[in-house]
Amino acid sequence: MNMETSHAKLFSLLFILLNSAWSIASSSISESFVQCLSSHIQNSNSSNGIILTRTSSAYPSVLDSSIQNLRFSNNSTPKPEAIITPFDESHVQAAVICSKKNGLQIRTRSGGHDYEGLSYVSISPFIIIDLFNLRSIDVDIENESAWVKSGATLGEVYYSIAQKSKVYGFPAGTCPTIGVGGHISGGGIGTIFRKYGLASDNVIDARIVDVNGRILDRNSMGEELFWAIRGGGGSSFGVILAWKLRLVPVPPAVTVCHITKTKEQGATKLLLKWQNIADKLPEELFIRPVIGSGDKTITVPCFLARLRNFSI
């Protein structure tokens, strides 16, 4: 019994020592990173508003602000050494350079709609670059394009386009709070993709910070990297700062309807029939079945015109 007690105490002591050593090493890395970043942000009015460490009062609220999967907001989830909230592209460059220098992983977050936690969790020491301050949108109707920074949401993009024109749009998703940085770099499916393709198909330029802290556009990054960031996950190759989008023509009025069916009302047969004729439907027609845990299946068709123009 004494031997077992001694072993238990020994293991407890070893655990405490290892945990203390890890905490000291983590603190040292964090301090070194903050010092490096502060030295690179000399032209900023206040680096304190850009760099949030674990001792910062705003750290918890900013960290949790766009975690969409609450399983990653518990105490056992690894937390970043620091959160960087850049106001300028140069701040992103500095964060990349200093994280590389200190051996820290980078997690880039724009809207946080990442249910696997890939934009805010890592098992290795890491920082989060949260782009919510980089959200400007410049719509150019004359040239049918728009420069959109990665921290903007889809809702903000749609609203900005609509403020300039009622007959232009952009083919992306339906959730207004999704950040364009991650949405487009992952492909981006929306209600008009049958006619115009994915969101990533309608990107004509981009700005990215690479691993060496350089800002590259389409010309300087090359076509292979430009191809990869449009669907291959932008954060796999750098930090996406902004996208240049191709705007597409849309009618001033569209037709949207909801069809609700239970299994007993023939929902399964309806879905089967849709699958059999889907490839024959006009490309202006988008149909999305929503199958929930309740009794009803909801089918949501959207037609890019008035209903009188619809024919098969």
Regions found by a protein language model. Give the residues of each.
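N-terminal accessory segments
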Residues: 2-196, 202, 215-216, 237-239, ...
